[in-house]
Protein backbone atom coordinates (compact mmCIF):
# COMPACT_ATOMS: atom_id res chain seq x y z
CA UNK A 1 0.00 0.00 0.00
CA UNK A 2 1.29 3.47 -0.88
CA UNK A 3 2.62 5.47 2.06
CA UNK A 4 1.32 9.01 1.62
CA UNK A 5 4.13 10.29 3.83
CA UNK A 6 6.64 9.19 1.22
CA UNK A 7 4.65 10.99 -1.46
CA UNK A 8 4.69 14.16 0.64
CA UNK A 9 8.48 13.91 0.78
CA UNK A 10 8.62 13.55 -2.99
CA UNK A 11 6.41 16.61 -3.45
CA UNK A 12 8.58 18.59 -1.05
CA UNK A 13 11.65 17.62 -3.09
CA UNK A 14 9.97 18.71 -6.30
CA UNK A 15 9.08 22.08 -4.79
CA UNK A 16 12.55 22.62 -3.40
CA UNK A 17 14.21 21.73 -6.69
CA UNK A 18 11.79 23.95 -8.60
CA UNK A 19 12.89 26.91 -6.48
CA UNK A 20 16.52 25.97 -7.06
CA UNK A 21 15.99 25.62 -10.81
CA UNK A 22 14.30 29.02 -11.01
CA UNK A 23 17.43 30.62 -9.57
CA UNK A 24 19.90 28.69 -11.74
CA UNK A 25 21.73 29.55 -14.96
CA UNK A 26 21.47 26.81 -17.59
CA UNK A 27 24.17 26.69 -20.25
CA UNK A 28 23.05 23.51 -22.01
CA UNK A 29 22.76 24.09 -25.79
CA UNK A 30 20.08 21.40 -26.21
CA UNK A 31 17.79 22.94 -23.59
CA UNK A 32 15.78 26.13 -23.32
CA UNK A 33 12.90 27.46 -21.26
CA UNK A 34 9.26 28.10 -22.02
CA UNK A 35 7.92 31.58 -21.46
CA UNK A 36 5.11 31.96 -18.90
CA UNK A 37 2.63 32.31 -21.77
CA UNK A 38 3.82 29.18 -23.59
CA UNK A 39 3.96 27.23 -20.32
CA UNK A 40 0.29 27.85 -19.59
CA UNK A 41 -1.33 25.06 -21.68
CA UNK A 42 0.74 22.39 -19.93
CA UNK A 43 -1.18 22.88 -16.69
CA UNK A 44 -4.63 22.86 -18.30
CA UNK A 45 -7.12 20.14 -19.10
CA UNK A 46 -5.85 20.10 -22.69
CA UNK A 47 -2.89 18.08 -21.47
CA UNK A 48 -5.35 15.18 -21.12
CA UNK A 49 -7.05 15.52 -24.52
CA UNK A 50 -6.73 14.18 -28.05
CA UNK A 51 -7.14 16.41 -31.09
CA UNK A 52 -7.37 15.05 -34.64
CA UNK A 53 -9.66 17.47 -36.49
CA UNK A 54 -6.93 19.46 -38.24
CA UNK A 55 -9.33 20.69 -40.91
CA UNK A 56 -11.94 21.83 -38.34
CA UNK A 57 -14.55 19.76 -40.15
CA UNK A 58 -17.87 20.36 -38.30
CA UNK A 59 -18.84 16.75 -39.00
CA UNK A 60 -15.60 15.26 -37.67
CA UNK A 61 -15.60 16.10 -33.97
CA UNK A 62 -14.93 12.55 -32.77
CA UNK A 63 -12.93 13.99 -29.84
CA UNK A 64 -14.40 17.25 -28.54
CA UNK A 65 -12.04 17.96 -25.65
CA UNK A 66 -9.97 20.41 -27.67
CA UNK A 67 -12.74 21.95 -29.73
CA UNK A 68 -12.79 25.34 -27.98
CA UNK A 69 -9.09 26.04 -28.57
CA UNK A 70 -8.61 24.15 -31.84
CA UNK A 71 -7.62 27.27 -33.75
CA UNK A 72 -4.61 27.77 -31.48
CA UNK A 73 -3.14 24.75 -33.25
CA UNK A 74 -4.60 25.08 -36.71
CA UNK A 75 -4.11 28.83 -37.09
CA UNK A 76 -1.82 30.15 -34.35
CA UNK A 77 0.79 27.37 -34.29
CA UNK A 78 0.73 26.44 -37.95
CA UNK A 79 0.28 30.02 -39.13
CA UNK A 80 3.10 31.57 -37.13
CA UNK A 81 5.49 28.68 -37.79
CA UNK A 82 4.73 28.94 -41.49
CA UNK A 83 5.52 32.64 -41.54
CA UNK A 84 8.70 32.20 -39.50
CA UNK A 85 10.03 29.53 -41.87
CA UNK A 86 8.55 31.10 -45.01
CA UNK A 87 7.12 27.67 -45.74
CA UNK A 88 3.43 27.24 -46.63
CA UNK A 89 3.34 23.64 -45.43
CA UNK A 90 3.94 22.81 -41.77
CA UNK A 91 3.52 19.55 -39.88
CA UNK A 92 3.43 20.37 -36.17
CA UNK A 93 2.52 16.88 -34.97
CA UNK A 94 5.97 15.31 -34.26
CA UNK A 95 6.49 14.93 -30.53
CA UNK A 96 10.30 15.32 -30.57
CA UNK A 97 13.28 15.72 -32.84
CA UNK A 98 13.67 11.96 -33.22
CA UNK A 99 9.96 11.70 -33.96
CA UNK A 100 10.41 14.25 -36.75
CA UNK A 101 13.45 12.30 -37.96
CA UNK A 102 11.45 9.07 -38.21
CA UNK A 103 8.66 10.77 -40.12
CA UNK A 104 11.07 12.48 -42.51
CA UNK A 105 12.91 9.25 -43.28
CA UNK A 106 9.74 7.18 -43.61
CA UNK A 107 8.02 9.78 -45.75
CA UNK A 108 10.91 10.87 -47.94
CA UNK A 109 13.31 7.92 -48.02
CA UNK A 110 11.46 5.94 -50.68
CA UNK A 111 10.93 2.16 -50.65
CA UNK A 112 12.86 0.02 -48.15
CA UNK A 113 16.29 -0.93 -49.39
CA UNK A 114 17.21 2.51 -50.69
CA UNK A 115 19.98 4.64 -49.22
CA UNK A 116 19.74 7.50 -46.75
CA UNK A 117 22.85 9.68 -46.54
CA UNK A 118 23.56 11.51 -43.27
CA UNK A 119 26.42 13.27 -41.53
CA UNK A 120 29.03 11.12 -39.84
CA UNK A 121 28.57 11.23 -36.05
CA UNK A 122 32.30 11.86 -35.64
CA UNK A 123 31.81 15.07 -37.65
CA UNK A 124 28.93 16.28 -35.49
CA UNK A 125 26.00 14.34 -36.90
CA UNK A 126 23.33 12.97 -34.56
CA UNK A 127 24.31 9.68 -32.96
CA UNK A 128 21.01 7.98 -33.87
CA UNK A 129 20.55 8.93 -37.53
CA UNK A 130 22.42 6.13 -39.30
CA UNK A 131 20.96 3.44 -37.06
CA UNK A 132 17.48 4.94 -37.43
CA UNK A 133 17.80 4.63 -41.21
CA UNK A 134 18.80 0.99 -40.92
CA UNK A 135 15.96 0.20 -38.50
CA UNK A 136 13.51 1.67 -41.00
CA UNK A 137 14.84 -0.68 -43.68
CA UNK A 138 17.23 1.65 -45.51
CA UNK A 139 20.91 1.38 -46.26
CA UNK A 140 22.97 4.04 -44.51
CA UNK A 141 25.86 6.05 -45.89
CA UNK A 142 27.58 8.90 -44.08
CA UNK A 143 29.68 11.87 -45.13
CA UNK A 144 32.18 13.94 -43.13
CA UNK A 145 31.68 17.62 -42.41
CA UNK A 146 34.40 20.08 -41.45
CA UNK A 147 33.50 23.53 -40.16
CA UNK A 148 30.00 23.30 -41.54
CA UNK A 149 31.06 22.19 -45.02
CA UNK A 150 30.33 18.73 -46.38
CA UNK A 151 33.37 17.02 -47.93
CA UNK A 152 32.47 17.61 -51.58
CA UNK A 153 34.62 14.87 -53.10
CA UNK A 154 33.34 12.27 -50.64
CA UNK A 155 29.75 13.42 -51.03
CA UNK A 156 29.91 13.38 -54.82
CA UNK A 157 31.22 9.82 -54.75
CA UNK A 158 28.41 8.74 -52.38
CA UNK A 159 25.81 10.29 -54.67
CA UNK A 160 27.20 8.53 -57.74
CA UNK A 161 27.61 5.14 -56.06
CA UNK A 162 24.39 4.99 -54.01
CA UNK A 163 21.98 7.30 -55.91
CA UNK A 164 20.17 7.92 -52.60
CA UNK A 165 16.51 8.74 -52.26
CA UNK A 166 17.22 11.04 -49.31
CA UNK A 167 20.10 13.14 -48.01
CA UNK A 168 19.43 13.89 -44.34
CA UNK A 169 21.76 16.62 -43.06
CA UNK A 170 21.72 16.35 -39.28
CA UNK A 171 24.52 18.52 -37.90
CA UNK A 172 24.04 18.78 -34.12
CA UNK A 173 27.50 19.43 -32.69
CA UNK A 174 28.91 22.39 -34.56
CA UNK A 175 30.32 25.84 -33.97
CA UNK A 176 29.73 26.66 -37.63
CA UNK A 177 26.67 27.24 -39.74
CA UNK A 178 25.89 24.31 -42.03
CA UNK A 179 26.48 25.23 -45.67
CA UNK A 180 23.44 23.86 -47.50
CA UNK A 181 23.62 25.55 -50.90
CA UNK A 182 26.68 23.65 -52.12
CA UNK A 183 25.11 20.34 -51.06
CA UNK A 184 21.99 21.22 -53.05
CA UNK A 185 24.14 22.05 -56.09
CA UNK A 186 25.96 18.71 -55.90
CA UNK A 187 22.67 16.83 -55.61
CA UNK A 188 21.33 18.63 -58.66
CA UNK A 189 24.47 17.74 -60.60
CA UNK A 190 24.86 14.09 -59.59
CA UNK A 191 21.46 12.82 -58.37
CA UNK A 192 18.69 15.31 -59.19
CA UNK A 193 15.82 13.11 -57.97
CA UNK A 194 17.34 12.94 -54.45
CA UNK A 195 15.45 14.81 -51.72
CA UNK A 196 17.48 17.07 -49.42
CA UNK A 197 16.24 17.38 -45.83
CA UNK A 198 17.97 19.50 -43.18
CA UNK A 199 17.51 18.60 -39.52
CA UNK A 200 18.13 21.94 -37.84
CA UNK A 201 17.13 20.92 -34.31
CA UNK A 202 19.99 22.78 -32.65
CA UNK A 203 19.83 25.91 -34.77
CA UNK A 204 16.05 26.11 -35.29
CA UNK A 205 15.69 29.31 -33.27
CA UNK A 206 18.64 30.96 -35.01
CA UNK A 207 17.20 30.08 -38.43
CA UNK A 208 13.63 31.12 -37.66
CA UNK A 209 14.98 34.28 -36.05
CA UNK A 210 17.05 35.13 -39.12
CA UNK A 211 20.52 34.94 -37.57
CA UNK A 212 21.37 31.94 -39.77
CA UNK A 213 20.29 31.18 -43.33
CA UNK A 214 17.04 29.34 -44.03
CA UNK A 215 17.89 25.92 -45.57
CA UNK A 216 14.78 26.12 -47.76
CA UNK A 217 16.20 29.26 -49.37
CA UNK A 218 19.48 27.42 -49.95
CA UNK A 219 17.95 24.53 -51.88
CA UNK A 220 16.70 22.09 -49.23
CA UNK A 221 13.37 20.50 -50.08
CA UNK A 222 12.34 20.06 -46.44
CA UNK A 223 13.63 20.96 -42.99
CA UNK A 224 12.65 20.35 -39.41
CA UNK A 225 13.69 19.16 -35.99
CA UNK A 226 13.03 19.68 -32.32
CA UNK A 227 11.60 22.89 -30.90
CA UNK A 228 13.29 23.21 -27.52
CA UNK A 229 16.96 24.00 -28.15
CA UNK A 230 17.80 27.39 -29.63
CA UNK A 231 14.07 27.77 -30.28
CA UNK A 232 12.40 28.46 -26.88
CA UNK A 233 9.50 26.07 -27.29
CA UNK A 234 8.17 22.85 -25.74
CA UNK A 235 9.61 19.38 -26.22
CA UNK A 236 8.08 18.86 -29.65
CA UNK A 237 9.11 18.59 -33.29
CA UNK A 238 8.12 20.25 -36.54
CA UNK A 239 8.58 19.71 -40.29
CA UNK A 240 8.53 22.39 -43.01
CA UNK A 241 8.37 22.32 -46.80
CA UNK A 242 7.35 24.46 -49.75
CA UNK A 243 6.28 21.42 -51.76
CA UNK A 244 2.65 20.23 -51.55
CA UNK A 245 3.71 16.76 -52.73
CA UNK A 246 6.37 16.36 -50.04
CA UNK A 247 3.97 17.73 -47.45
CA UNK A 248 1.52 14.96 -48.30
CA UNK A 249 4.25 12.34 -48.11
CA UNK A 250 5.25 13.56 -44.65
CA UNK A 251 1.62 13.70 -43.56
CA UNK A 252 1.01 10.14 -44.74
CA UNK A 253 4.04 8.87 -42.79
CA UNK A 254 2.97 10.84 -39.73
CA UNK A 255 -0.54 9.38 -39.84
CA UNK A 256 0.73 5.82 -39.45
CA UNK A 257 3.66 6.56 -37.11
CA UNK A 258 2.05 8.85 -34.54
CA UNK A 259 -1.32 8.91 -32.80
CA UNK A 260 -1.28 11.40 -29.95
CA UNK A 261 0.74 14.47 -30.90
CA UNK A 262 0.59 15.84 -27.34
CA UNK A 263 -2.10 18.47 -27.74
CA UNK A 264 -1.12 20.72 -24.83
CA UNK A 265 2.49 20.84 -25.99
CA UNK A 266 1.27 21.75 -29.48
CA UNK A 267 -0.76 24.62 -28.03
CA UNK A 268 2.38 25.68 -26.16
CA UNK A 269 4.30 25.58 -29.44
CA UNK A 270 1.71 27.87 -31.01
CA UNK A 271 2.04 30.43 -28.22
CA UNK A 272 5.84 30.20 -28.33
CA UNK A 273 5.78 30.77 -32.09
CA UNK A 274 3.49 33.78 -31.69
CA UNK A 275 5.89 35.35 -29.19
CA UNK A 276 8.86 34.45 -31.37
CA UNK A 277 7.46 36.41 -34.28
CA UNK A 278 7.68 39.47 -32.02
CA UNK A 279 11.01 38.78 -30.28
CA UNK A 280 12.71 36.15 -32.44
CA UNK A 281 14.98 38.26 -34.61
CA UNK A 282 16.45 40.28 -31.74
CA UNK A 283 16.77 37.11 -29.63
CA UNK A 284 18.58 35.14 -32.34
CA UNK A 285 21.03 37.95 -33.05
CA UNK A 286 21.71 38.33 -29.31
CA UNK A 287 22.32 34.60 -28.89
CA UNK A 288 25.10 34.61 -31.48
CA UNK A 289 26.55 37.85 -30.10
CA UNK A 290 26.53 36.44 -26.56
CA UNK A 291 28.22 33.20 -27.62
CA UNK A 292 30.97 35.11 -29.40
CA UNK A 293 31.44 37.52 -26.51
CA UNK A 294 31.66 34.70 -23.97
CA UNK A 295 34.27 32.96 -26.11
CA UNK A 296 36.29 36.16 -26.41
CA UNK A 297 36.18 36.85 -22.66
CA UNK A 298 37.09 33.30 -21.67
CA UNK A 299 39.94 33.10 -24.19
CA UNK A 300 41.33 36.42 -22.95
CA UNK A 301 41.26 35.02 -19.42
CA UNK A 302 43.32 31.99 -20.40
CA UNK A 303 40.62 29.39 -20.99
CA UNK A 304 41.12 26.87 -23.79
CA UNK A 305 38.29 27.95 -26.08
CA UNK A 306 38.02 25.93 -29.27
CA UNK A 307 38.48 28.26 -32.25
CA UNK A 308 39.67 28.33 -35.84
CA UNK A 309 43.12 29.57 -36.81
CA UNK A 310 41.72 33.07 -37.29
CA UNK A 311 40.25 33.08 -33.77
CA UNK A 312 36.65 32.44 -34.87
CA UNK A 313 34.99 30.53 -32.02
CA UNK A 314 31.36 30.18 -33.11
CA UNK A 315 28.63 31.17 -35.53
CA UNK A 316 25.92 29.45 -33.50
CA UNK A 317 24.71 29.21 -29.91
CA UNK A 318 27.40 26.65 -29.06
CA UNK A 319 30.81 27.35 -27.51
CA UNK A 320 33.32 24.59 -26.68
CA UNK A 321 35.79 24.94 -23.82
CA UNK A 322 38.40 22.44 -22.63
CA UNK A 323 39.12 22.45 -18.91
CA UNK A 324 41.46 19.47 -18.57
CA UNK A 325 41.14 15.77 -17.93
CA UNK A 326 37.96 14.07 -16.72
CA UNK A 327 38.67 14.75 -13.05
CA UNK A 328 39.46 18.42 -13.61
CA UNK A 329 36.42 18.90 -15.83
CA UNK A 330 34.10 17.23 -13.35
CA UNK A 331 35.48 19.32 -10.49
CA UNK A 332 34.99 22.51 -12.51
CA UNK A 333 31.46 21.50 -13.50
CA UNK A 334 30.56 20.68 -9.89
CA UNK A 335 31.88 24.01 -8.64
CA UNK A 336 29.67 25.83 -11.11
CA UNK A 337 26.71 23.60 -10.23
CA UNK A 338 27.16 24.38 -6.54
CA UNK A 339 26.97 28.04 -7.50
CA UNK A 340 23.80 27.62 -9.53
CA UNK A 341 25.38 27.36 -12.99
CA UNK A 342 24.72 24.20 -15.00
CA UNK A 343 27.01 23.20 -17.84
CA UNK A 344 27.02 20.32 -20.32
CA UNK A 345 30.05 18.00 -20.53
CA UNK A 346 30.56 16.04 -23.77
CA UNK A 347 33.24 13.48 -24.58
CA UNK A 348 32.74 13.05 -28.34
CA UNK A 349 32.79 16.49 -29.93
CA UNK A 350 34.32 16.60 -33.43
CA UNK A 351 38.10 16.73 -33.28
CA UNK A 352 38.19 17.05 -29.49
CA UNK A 353 39.06 13.85 -27.62
CA UNK A 354 38.23 13.75 -23.95
CA UNK A 355 35.77 15.80 -21.90
CA UNK A 356 34.80 19.25 -23.18
CA UNK A 357 32.29 21.81 -21.96
CA UNK A 358 29.67 22.21 -24.69
CA UNK A 359 28.14 25.51 -23.67
CA UNK A 360 24.97 27.12 -24.99
CA UNK A 361 23.87 30.68 -24.25
CA UNK A 362 20.38 30.28 -25.73
CA UNK A 363 18.45 29.98 -22.45
CA UNK A 364 20.47 32.67 -20.69
CA UNK A 365 19.74 35.00 -23.60
CA UNK A 366 16.03 34.18 -23.74
CA UNK A 367 15.66 35.08 -20.07
CA UNK A 368 17.30 38.47 -20.55
CA UNK A 369 21.04 37.89 -20.61
CA UNK A 370 22.83 40.58 -22.63
CA UNK A 371 26.44 41.82 -22.57
CA UNK A 372 26.53 42.66 -18.86
CA UNK A 373 25.30 39.19 -17.91
CA UNK A 374 27.90 37.55 -20.18
CA UNK A 375 30.66 39.55 -18.49
CA UNK A 376 29.35 38.43 -15.09
CA UNK A 377 29.20 34.83 -16.30
CA UNK A 378 32.81 34.94 -17.49
CA UNK A 379 33.83 36.13 -14.03
CA UNK A 380 32.10 33.13 -12.47
CA UNK A 381 34.10 30.83 -14.74
CA UNK A 382 37.26 32.51 -13.45
CA UNK A 383 36.09 31.99 -9.87
CA UNK A 384 35.48 28.31 -10.58
CA UNK A 385 38.94 27.85 -12.05
CA UNK A 386 40.69 29.76 -9.28
CA UNK A 387 38.56 28.33 -6.46
CA UNK A 388 37.49 31.68 -5.03
CA UNK A 389 34.14 33.09 -3.84
CA UNK A 390 32.73 29.80 -2.58
CA UNK A 391 29.46 31.40 -1.53
CA UNK A 392 26.98 29.58 -3.78
CA UNK A 393 25.75 32.89 -5.22
CA UNK A 394 27.24 32.74 -8.71
CA UNK A 395 23.96 32.44 -10.57
CA UNK A 396 22.51 35.31 -8.56
CA UNK A 397 25.37 37.61 -9.56
CA UNK A 398 24.75 36.78 -13.22
CA UNK A 399 20.98 37.17 -12.94
CA UNK A 400 21.38 40.59 -11.37
CA UNK A 401 22.78 41.71 -14.72
CA UNK A 402 19.81 40.50 -16.77
CA UNK A 403 17.89 42.92 -18.93
CA UNK A 404 14.40 42.47 -20.39
CA UNK A 405 13.61 38.90 -21.49
CA UNK A 406 12.61 37.94 -25.02
CA UNK A 407 8.98 37.19 -24.18
CA UNK A 408 5.89 39.05 -22.98
CA UNK A 409 6.33 39.60 -19.24
CA UNK A 410 2.69 40.57 -18.71
CA UNK A 411 1.77 36.87 -18.69
CA UNK A 412 4.20 36.05 -15.87
UniProtKB/Swiss-Prot annotation:
It is an enzyme of class 2 (transferase). It catalyses: uridine-5'-aldehyde + L-threonine = (5'S,6'S)-C-glycyluridine + acetaldehyde. The modification N6-(pyridoxal phosphate)lysine is found at residue 229. Pfam families: SHMT (PF00464). It comes from the Bacteria. Pathway: Antibiotic biosynthesis. Coiled coil: none annotated. GO terms for molecular function: glycine hydroxymethyltransferase activity; pyridoxal phosphate binding. Its cofactor is pyridoxal 5'-phosphate. One of its GO terms (biological process) is tetrahydrofolate metabolic process. GO terms for cellular component: cytoplasm. Keywords: Antibiotic biosynthesis, Pyridoxal phosphate, Transferase. Its EC number is 2.2.1.-. InterPro entries: PyrdxlP-dep_Trfase, PyrdxlP-dep_Trfase_major, PyrdxlP-dep_Trfase_small, Ser_HO-MeTrfase-like, SHMT-like_dom. Transaldolase involved in the biosynthesis of the capuramycin-type nucleoside antibiotic A-503083. Catalyzes the condensation of L-threonine and uridine-5'-aldehyde to form 5'-C-glycyluridine (GlyU). Forms (5'S,6'S)-GlyU. Belongs to the SHMT family. This is L-threonine:uridine-5'-aldehyde transaldolase. The gene is capH.
Amino acid sequence: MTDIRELRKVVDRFRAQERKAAASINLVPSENKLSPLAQMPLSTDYYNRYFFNDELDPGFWQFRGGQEVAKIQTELARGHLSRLARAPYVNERPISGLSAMMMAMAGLGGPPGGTVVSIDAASGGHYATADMARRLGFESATVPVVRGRVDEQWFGQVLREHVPELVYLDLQNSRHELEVSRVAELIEAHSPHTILHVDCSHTMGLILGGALSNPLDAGAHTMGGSTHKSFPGPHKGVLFTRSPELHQRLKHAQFTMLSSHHFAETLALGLAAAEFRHFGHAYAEQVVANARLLGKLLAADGFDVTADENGHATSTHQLWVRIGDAEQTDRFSKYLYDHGIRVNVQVDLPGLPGPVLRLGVNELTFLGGHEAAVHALAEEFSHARDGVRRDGEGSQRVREQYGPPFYFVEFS
